[in-house]
């Protein structure tokens, strides 16, 4: 058995070495970006050995290799972009050319072979699916107003829970995550979860399991043949995906059983209606990307990405408000003067909340939820700047480096909402072009509008009622974070101290 295994490994190694040599010969033409040292079989992996997370390592390598450099990820040729000029060329100017996604073991498992939006193959079916999801975001009432009502409903429940804690030290993020999850559930399933619902707890467990394991299996994505050997992380990932799929499949079957043409009130029903229309028009549901697999994976994609993006961004907001009480106080003063205490905040207040808007922008700059965007792939021979980019090249955009570029931002590592205000204290969208918190172009994040609404409403609702601080005897939250699918903060405890002004509201009427 050991001889057979050794023979298999040698055979695979020979094939990969041959492919690597072929790839390097193919890349010999044109002006290519400066490349990290590369060796047969392993590519540039030796140059990537570091205690630094990938986004910080790429930022460090930028000083030696430039804003655009290349590397071999085993047999795969890739380029890393560290500045906004090249990033916007890829995402905007040449968005369709670079709209591809790499096929990788972990993402293929997550998406059943790219049958979703995040990892799906760019083409007519993918664009149709994306259009359907955008339709779902405009389901409730007049679009964003309906979504606002859902967010405020969850904010009410969340703040009531916090008031009952009576200043006790606790981890607030499970309650925040449930609120964010319920908004997504209403969009996808037209249902919500109570705090102690066992299914909700299961969903949180599998979601966290996916976040924890995907980033650890990068070698399997570089060398797919490793999946055939024992791997604890891959086993855990498969278990989490199986649990996710079991829950989503049940919801999908329930929707199919109860579907009627008048029930297009959530994403599953919108997808089912599109499938029925395609069948009535004798169109291929497979070509339209409307098989059962496509529909379940699209909902899984929106559900997973929507929850992790918004809850992670809000966690960073709380952490920085704790570390910068002067910023928190200034937001509270803005709330007090523009909203008061006789009503709760709403989206129509956004135009008067300059400092809160600036703070949200600064949070998304200094701690981008996804420091490395999902890799793109060149669908044809092309170029970035003055460099040749062959078809099939993987393109990694280092959003962290773009948001911490010393040439574009003054003191980029300092937390300063004022950088998004003009001389009169009015909010400006960005003081630099080096700002892409949700990506841009063809593959821009679908949940951008929802994430911004949740950040604005949840932050303003909480700060209207509470002051967020470190509980006595506890350390302040860590600002480093843990690299994975998202840049996730480490767990932390807070004390939500009820504001006197909120307690005394209405006493002087």
Curated annotation (Swiss-Prot):
Catalytic activity: a C21-steroid + reduced [NADPH--hemoprotein reductase] + O2 = a 17alpha-hydroxy-C21-steroid + oxidized [NADPH--hemoprotein reductase] + H2O + H(+); 17alpha-hydroxyprogesterone + reduced [NADPH--hemoprotein reductase] + O2 = androst-4-ene-3,17-dione + acetate + oxidized [NADPH--hemoprotein reductase] + H2O + 2 H(+); 17alpha-hydroxypregnenolone + reduced [NADPH--hemoprotein reductase] + O2 = 3beta-hydroxyandrost-5-en-17-one + acetate + oxidized [NADPH--hemoprotein reductase] + H2O + 2 H(+)
Cross-referenced InterPro entries: Cyt_P450 (IPR001128), Cyt_P450_CS (IPR017972), Cyt_P450_E_grp-I (IPR002401), Cyt_P450_sf (IPR036396)
Keywords assigned: Heme, Iron, Lipid metabolism, Lyase, Membrane, Metal-binding, Monooxygenase, Oxidoreductase, Steroidogenesis
Superkingdom classification of source: Eukaryota
Pathway membership, UniProt: Lipid metabolism; steroid biosynthesis
Cellular location(s): Membrane
GO MF assignments: heme binding; iron ion binding; lyase activity; steroid 17-alpha-monooxygenase activity
Binding site for heme: 445
Enzyme Commission numbers on file: 1.14.14.19, 1.14.14.32
Cofactor(s) in the UniProt record: heme
GO CC term (a single one): membrane
GO terms classed as biological process: hormone biosynthetic process; progesterone metabolic process; steroid biosynthetic process
Pfam families according to UniProt: p450
Chief location bin: membrane
Transmembrane portions of the chain: none
Protein family membership: Belongs to the cytochrome P450 family.
Function: Conversion of pregnenolone and progesterone to their 17-alpha-hydroxylated products and subsequently to dehydroepiandrosterone (DHEA) and androstenedione. Catalyzes both the 17-alpha-hydroxylation and the 17,20-lyase reaction.
UniProt-recorded name of the protein: Steroid 17-alpha-hydroxylase/17,20 lyase
